[in-house]
Every structure is written in structure tokens, then in C-alpha cells.
Amino acid sequence: MPVQQRCTVVEMTPINPTTYWMVLEVGNMVEELGLRAGQFLHVACGEANLLRRPISVALAYPDEPEDTAALIFEVKGEGTRWLARRQVGDTVDVLGPLGNGFAVENGGRYLLVGGGIGTPPLLGYAEAFRQNAVAVLGFRSADRVILEERYREACKEVYLCTDDGSAGRHGFVDAQVRDILEKDKNFTAILACGPRPMLKSVAAGAAEFGVPCQ
């Protein structure tokens, strides 16, 4: 059952000119409500706190004195611009946890496929499964790449793709996914998060090779 509460900002760091890493103290959402990576929180944005924005959870930890959750968001309008101006010690109105996240099993081996701002929700799974995780990360261009170092520290292998070829492989992630599955399809599942066209292409490739996809 989602709860509404005021959460304190304990970290706010720009990742690039339009993307921010924000860590909140979230009460007992992790330990008692099961908040985890891949879910999201509805954060009220604006002085009147009238507009809520769904922000994906990249990491969630039981902690003291309160559980913590790392959220990553892009500045796209007035609401997220307001959110980016929050400072450590400020509080924001949060509703959550919401969404289902991914169904995973201990000891599983996973192919993580993230596109753009769909990359953060998979970070918790990369850090949980580490050498049992392979990641394919796709972005529009080199200046939009986020979290690459975190994924490289965690995963056995990381493949980077950009639409314009300015970093990593030139093209979309689905081509890289197919190349991986042609050589090795021994994955428990593919976990994918990103734009709808990307998800459809990745799901089609997964079906072709008989690998479950979420």
C-alpha cells in the first residue's frame, strides 16, 4: 500500500547538465513496504506541491535512521526544474512505492538493457547480480551517457551504444542484444527499460532466441 510522506533530501548531484542524482530518506519504505529498484515514487514538484512526477528508483537500501532511495531524473519542464533546485536538507512530498519493478531470482543471470533515462531503474539489479549481469546501455549521444562507470564497476560486461555513434557502438541497443544472444543465450531473463519502440525491438529479439523478457 503506497504511503504519502515528507522525505528529506540527503544528496543532490548533477550527472550532466539536464540529469540529476537525488537521494532521499524515505522512512521505512524499503524495509517494511518493499521499495526496490525499478519501482518509482510520485514526487510533488512546485511550490504549491500540486504536480506530481513519477521518478524511477535506481537504488533502495534499508538504513538508519531512515531507509534511503536514489532517484535519477531529467529536467524536462517547470516541475522537474523546481525539483533540481532542491538542496540537501530540503523536504519533498512523496507518494510510494508504486509500480512492480522486475521479478528476479537469486543466482539468476540477467541481460540488462537500458535506453536513456530507462537506464537508472536497472542499476540496482546490476549491483545485486554483478558478475551474473551483462548490460547494454543506449543513449542518443556521448553527452547524454549516464551511469556508465557504475555499471562497469558492477557488471561482468557492459556494451555502450549511441544513436549518432559518438560513443560506443553506432546504433540502437537491439542490434547489440541480438549479437550477444547469437553467442550466448544462457540468461535467466532480459530486463529492459526504456522507450516503447526499444522495448518492442528487444522483446522481439528475446522471443527469437527463446529468452524470457520483462
Where are these regions (language model features)?
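Ferredoxin-reductase
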Residues: P2-V88
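FNR/FR-type flavoprotein reductase catalytic core
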Residues: E78-Q214
